[in-house]
């Protein structure tokens, strides 16, 4: 141990869990190694990790309640794209293993694109089951956005295997479904399962709009994802509509 350099100590600590690294560095510190700053760093990491675990446990409160009532497969459901002027609405349903936490999960709107992309892969990998449904702008114009959203959610749920026996939703109640439903206001911030669904829906939709950007570059879909930004409205007034615009949403911007 006496010949270890600080770089070697850092490399060894990086191989360990945060708690193991603290124990390793504490042992070195007690034998005279100057690792105070490195030890402080790992204590800060531990505090950050503990706060994150506490946040995630709070986000499992609705799931724990459902488990206590005897439900086994609890699905979180959410959508992306109710408000944009163009493109589809996308819904996702996710059943996670009971008690599972995934660090960083939150309402998709509170995450960066890179965070969402990373979590998208991790959620799909760790979920017991998930479903994703895309409902296009033509159907939205035909039945209105609320009904299109409900159809997307119902279709996403129908893809689950095993089937959910309890559904947590972000402030929506679905029609003609006998499964227990728990609508939660601001559910994507309060339920881990709904937050996971919000990430799957958001990433799926964002990727689609990026593809549309290559097809219709004059509108800037990759930047605003179809929402009514000044850039988007200006492009509509200049170039008119393209096939993915929602006619029922853009009446105020076209003559």
UniProtKB/Swiss-Prot annotation:
CDD domains: RNase_HII_bacteria_HII_like. It is found in: Cytoplasm. GO terms for cellular component: cytoplasm; ribonuclease H2 complex. GO terms for molecular function: manganese ion binding; RNA binding; RNA-DNA hybrid ribonuclease activity. Keywords: Cytoplasm, Endonuclease, Hydrolase, Manganese, Metal-binding, Nuclease. It catalyses: Endonucleolytic cleavage to 5'-phosphomonoester. The keyword Cytoplasm applies. Its cofactor is Mn(2+); Mg(2+). The keyword Manganese applies. Residues 72-255 form the RNase H type-2 domain. Its EC number is 3.1.26.4. It comes from the Bacteria. Manganese or magnesium. Binds 1 divalent metal ion per monomer in the absence of substrate. May bind a second metal ion after substrate binding. InterPro entries: RNase_HII (IPR022898), RNase_HII/HIII (IPR001352), RNase_HII/HIII_dom (IPR024567), RNaseH-like_sf (IPR012337), RNaseH_sf (IPR036397). SUPFAM superfamilies: Ribonuclease H-like. A divalent metal cation binds at residues 78-79, 170. It is an enzyme of class 3 (hydrolase). GO terms for biological process: DNA replication, removal of RNA primer; mismatch repair. Endonuclease that specifically degrades the RNA of RNA-DNA hybrids. Belongs to the RNase HII family. This is Ribonuclease HII.
């Amino acid at each position: 141990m006496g010949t270890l350099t600080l770089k070697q100590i850092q490399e060894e600590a990086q191989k360990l869990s945060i708690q193991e690294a603290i124990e390793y560095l504490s042992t070195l510190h007690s034998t005279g190694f100057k690792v105070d700053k490195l030890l402080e760093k790992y204590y800060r990491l531990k505090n950050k990790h503990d706060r994150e675990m506490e946040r995630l446990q709070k986000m499992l409160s609705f799931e724990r309640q459902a488990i206590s009532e005897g439900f086994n497969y609890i699905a979180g459901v959410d959508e992306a794209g109710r408000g944009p002027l163009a493109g589809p609405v996308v819904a996702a349903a996710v059943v996670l293993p009971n008690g599972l936490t995934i660090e960083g999960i939150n309402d998709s709107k509170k995450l960066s694109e890179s965070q969402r992309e990373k979590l998208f892969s991790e959620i799909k990998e760790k979920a017991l089951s998930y479903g994703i449904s895309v409902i296009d702008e033509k159907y939205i114009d035909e039945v209105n956005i609320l009904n299109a959203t409900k159809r997307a959610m119902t279709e996403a749920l129908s893809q689950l295997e095993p089937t959910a026996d309890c559904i947590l939703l972000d402030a929506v109640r679905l029609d003609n479904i006998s499964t227990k439903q728990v609508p939660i206001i601001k559910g994507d911030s309060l339920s881990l399962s709904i937050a996971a669904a919000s990430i799957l829906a958001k990433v799926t939709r964002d990727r689609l709009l990026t593809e549309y950007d290559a097809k219709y570059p004059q509108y800037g879909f990759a930047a605003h994802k179809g929402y009514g930004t000044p850039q988007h409205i200006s492009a509509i007034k200049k170039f008119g509509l393209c096939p993915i615009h929602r006619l029922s949403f853009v009446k105020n911007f076209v003559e």
